[in-house]
Amino acid sequence: MGDSDDEYDRKRRDKFRGERSAGGGGDSYGRGADRPDRSRGRDDWPDRVRPRQDYRDYRPPPRDRGYSPAREGPTVKRMRGDTWGDEGRHRFGAHDGYGMYGYAHDHFGMHPTVGPYGHQHATHQREPVVSGDMQTQPCMMTLKQFLATQDDSISDSDAITKYNEYKLEFRRQQMNEFFVAHKDEEWFKIKYHPEESQKRKEEQLSFLKRRCEVFLELLKSKEIGKVSVDASNTDALLRLLDTVVIKLEGGTEEDLKVLDIKPSVVEAAARTPATLNEEKVKTESKVDATAKELAVKMEEDSSKQETETDVLSVPQSEEDARNGNSKIKEELSKSMDDGNENGDKSKSNDAQKSEKEIAEVEHEAHKHESEDRKKRSRSDSGSSSSSSSSSSSSESEEEKDERMNKEDNEDEENMRIPEEEKKSDSADTMDNINRDKEVDEGKPVCDAEDLNTADDRDDNADQNKEQNEFEETTKDKNSSDPVNDENKENSDKKSQQEGDSKAETIDLAKDPADGGSRALHRTSSIFLRNLAPSITKAEVEAMCRRYNGFLRVAIADPLLERRWFRRGWVTFKREVNIKEICWNLNNIRLRDCELGAIVNKDLSRRVRPVNGITCHKTVVRSDIKLGAKIAHNLDDKWGLWKETPTAASGTGEAGDKNGSEVQPEESFGLQSKNPVLQNITDYLIEEASAEEEELLGLSEDSKKVSEGELIERDPQLIEVLDRLILYLRIVHSVDFYNHCEYPYEDEMPNRCGIIHARGPPSQSKVMSNEIQEYIRTFEGKMASFLTRMVDIDETDMKKLGAKDAEAEVEKFITANTQELAKDKWLCPLSGKKFKGPDFVRKHIFNKHAEKVEEVRKEVEYFNNYLKDSKRPQLPEHPGNAKKPGSEGATSATANASVGAGGYRNQPFGMSHSYAPMYASYAAASMMAPNPRGRAGFGRGGRMGGPDYRPVIHYRDLDAPREPDEFL
């Protein structure tokens, strides 16, 4: 009786298992200790990667479960190497070498089923190598494939005509499918929808006009002329850009004073909680010394208080001295009930204050002076109260005096302290949990001075809380107490001093309500890495508006490589706790999409240098010409200077002569009303003494070509160029020296964040051909700004399948007119029945006019998409670009390309544009023939030099062998 399937698999797996053990050799079957371990786990190998195969496939006669021999590759013996482990697998985790080229058996023997490191391949062996997420159009039929579908009697001209029609119809179908797939997405509507696109254009035009107003304001104030676009002038450039941002945010001249403050001060005012924790750790080493100093000061204050008490009042007994100490304890500690631990609590309170960063000696002096005055007043009140009541004990006298003084302070603060200080004090009475809650909500973190004033407010808040507890019992006593007037004066002085100390702490990153300077150019932002195409900007704004300090949202255009996912930037005010907000956003899924929120760092280098050759006079003159063309082209695109704007009413007579006429000629100084382009042609004309050189026989050009020339700066030309560069950067968001445009910059966290400037010039001579090559290269990079957007004409649009609005309306009416029976028609939109189709038509126009209007808008929507010459669409299939009959040429280039960049040769006859039939880390090919001139595995040379072909000769076997005949 034959073995079962399980027994067969067990024997086959255990055949070489002992030889692959970690011991390295010996008779594995002689070791009885290892056998039980192997037999126990041989039936269940969880880390086994190789798929199980039916052992019947190895038998010569075909069985019922075997595959066709034509659809399966030959069985190849696997090769063992030094890298094989005890489990019979390659150490990299790739598949065993059972297949043709290191792959497992599949329905097709040469199918790549497993990729490097055991990953699955996403492409067929005959499909071109593309990324897994890349989407392409379907493969179009070749001419040969198309002719196979046609009649054999078709002529050549008809075949070519029909094939061209097929290609055109294929393009129509692909564009229509792309439109239907993306027409409901926000980014697509912003580009082509008749209503959404118009709103977007108006919004962008308002941004441009606002930027233009700010630029003209700075131009009139001569702020633009003071700045040169050089990398050595970084501070002035950054100040100008920050000034523009503050003015765009609606800032005033008071807000511009923030730019005059050193960055270190601004950074100290905008510290994060992590920074405060670091500073707190640094100051812990100084806590003990500060506590000792404060203890000495408080002892001196207590001694002064005792002497002043002796002078102002009758000498008191030991109870009065203890009464005075209790007043000191009242001001320094939060607890009032423990009278036996006055010294310990005063020291602990001092240490607590020093831990909260007591930074300024002046602030401490003011605080101690107020405490001295308060103690003197309380000692007087304590002495008078103790002398008036003789029947009660000393402890009861102390409690009564404390309650009376508290109530006096409360009444005085309610009368004298302004309304704003009341609100701040009431807010400070919250406990630690509420304070943590405020931090979670994103409120700003105070600096060292704010911590000092907050500490004082905490003490006052504790006093107010205790005063409220005894309010009912002491109200009558305080109203009849003659000491109230003196206490009111002292508390009034104390409140004024506290108000002065609060006014000294100003956080520059905050937005104060009293109209102080605001750092509007500094923001905090969060970067959203993944936004599904279905997520709208309004949804992101609604999600982020719940957090304090929210400003705006910017969403980029989708990318094909990222499956049309978009990226977003959420901008907040500078003082918010941006990390807490980012953590909350990471816990939110919007439309079942993880946002991938991370904190966006500040810009590292805002002014970046470029080649120093840009300072040369020849290059500057070329850049002026190029920049003037770009500025004129962008102004004409948005229509900024077509009509006389109010901001540029006094720019000169040249702008008034033209009125609102628009002429297509590119005449900069005469036809443009832009003040930057006025009289710019005077600087574009080059002057040279050509006649003098000709008469004298001089040849300056030949000297320049042979010897080169030093970089020469022309300050007048550079001033004109800088004005152009700053106009493009501020108004149109075009970084001239970086030859790029920063899109949707008005919604980004950093407006006018980066600019490229001229670097330091070289001290060596520059050849003329180098200058011309630089100018030519720079013009090529800026060519995209010089070409005007031209829409497709009507004839081409009809070829691409442009729709007619009236025809589509008729189709809509026909589709919604259904005949039920004779003289019985139905309108499916409303469910009403009519006697004829004309009545249904009239009903649709009257009752469903909005549906008809939607059809017209849909037609305009689609036509706007077709009209765009740079419309987004899926890339063509790589197989469409392949020319038929070029397989021989591509195979040669394939071998060259793989030999240069690959690890081993491609399979024979494979093109370089297709995926190889073996994985990068799989077993090497054992059956593919090698190209000529390369050694194989079993041939001489060991993959060394060329292996020469044997000489072919012919010999008659019946003839005798000649002595010089070679074999």
Swiss-Prot record:
CDD domains noted in UniProt: RRM_SF (cd00590)
Biased composition (Basic and acidic residues): 8-20, 32-66, 296-307, 319-374, 414-426, 433-446, 460-513
Sorted UniProt keywords: Nucleus, RNA-mediated gene silencing
Chief localisation class: nucleus
Protein's UniProt name: Serrate RNA effector molecule homolog
Similarity comment text for this entry: Belongs to the ARS2 family.
Function: Acts as a mediator between the cap-binding complex (CBC) and RNA-mediated gene silencing (RNAi). Involved in innate immunity via the short interfering RNAs (siRNAs) processing machinery by restricting the viral RNA production. Also involved microRNA (miRNA)-mediated silencing by contributing to the stability and delivery of primary miRNA transcripts to the primary miRNA processing complex.
Comp. bias (Acidic residues): 447-459
InterPro entries from the UniProt entry: Nucleotide-bd_a/b_plait_sf, RBD_domain_sf, SE/Ars2, SERRATE/Ars2_C, SERRATE/Ars2_N
UniProt organism field: Anopheles gambiae
Subcellular location(s) of the protein: Nucleus
